[in-house]
Amino acid sequence: MIIELLTPEPSAWDAASVLVRAANYAASLVAGGAALFHAGFSAQMRQADSASVRRLAAGASAAAIALSVAALIVRAGVLSGGGGILEARVWEAMMTSRIGDAFWIRLAGLLAIAALATRITVAPHLAVAGALAVAASYAAMGHSMLYRPRQGIAALVVVHLACVSFWVGSLLPLARLARGRDGETVAILADWSRIARPVVAVLIASGLALAALMVRRFDLLYATAYGSGLSVKLLLVAVMLALAARHAFVLSPAAARLEPGAGNRLARSIRLEAAVSLLVFWAAAEMVSIHPLDAGHRIAA
C-alpha cells in the first residue's frame, strides 16, 4: 500500500489490494496454525483451552473466507479500473486464471479447518490437511508462477508458509496458556518450544532460499522496490526472533519456576510478537505487489 501510494500515479485499487492481501495472510495462516497447534497439543490441554483453539481456528477461517472474497472484488477493481467490477467478462477471466485456482484451493482448505467447530470425528485430520492446502494456495499464483525454477519456488513457498502458519498460529493459544500456573501448561510450552526451533530453522532457510531465487544477484536487490519490501520484512522477522529468544531463554524458564507474574509477562510478550507478525504480513503483501527485476529467470507469458 505504502509503495503504491509513493508512485507517480497511485491506484486506490492497488493500494487496497495490499491491505486486503495482508489481512488475508494473517487470517488464513493463523487459522492453519491454530489447526496445527490443536493437532499437536489438544491431548495435553484442558478442555476449555482446546475449545478456545478450535474457536480461534474456525473464527480465523471465517474471516479468511470473507477476506478471500473481498480480495476477488478488489482484484476485479484492479483489472477493470473500477468501472467494470461487476462485469461477467472480468469475473470469468479472473476465475478461470490462476487467481481462481488459488481461491478455490484456499476456500477448500479454510472450510476443512472450520470443521474443527463441529463434532466430526475426523475434523482434526481435515483441519491439518486444510492448513497445508491454505499454504499451497499461495503457491498457485503470484511470483511462484512467474519465475524459474517454478516448481522449486512453489515447493519452497508451501514449506515456508506452513512453517509461518505453525509459528504465528500458535501465538495466541500460547499466550492464553502462559497465564496458567500448573505442570501441564509448563509441559506444553516446553514441548512447543522444542518443536518450534527446527520449524523456525526451516522457515528461515526456505525464506532465504526464496529470496536468492527471486533476486538472482545482490546488486539487483534494490533495482525495484521489491528489495525495500524484503529488507523491511527481514527486519521485522528479526524482531520476532528476538522476542522468541527472550521467551525461550528468559520468560519461559521463569514461568516454569512459577515465579510470581512470570506467566503474565510471558503472555504479554507473546501478544507483542503476534502484533509484530501483522507487520510482517503487511511487508509480505507489499513485496508480492512488486516484481523483482528480471535477471533472465522470468517466465515468458
Q: Where are the language model's segments positioned?
A:
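Polytopic transmembrane helical bundles with strong interfacial aromatic enrichment
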Residues: 1-301
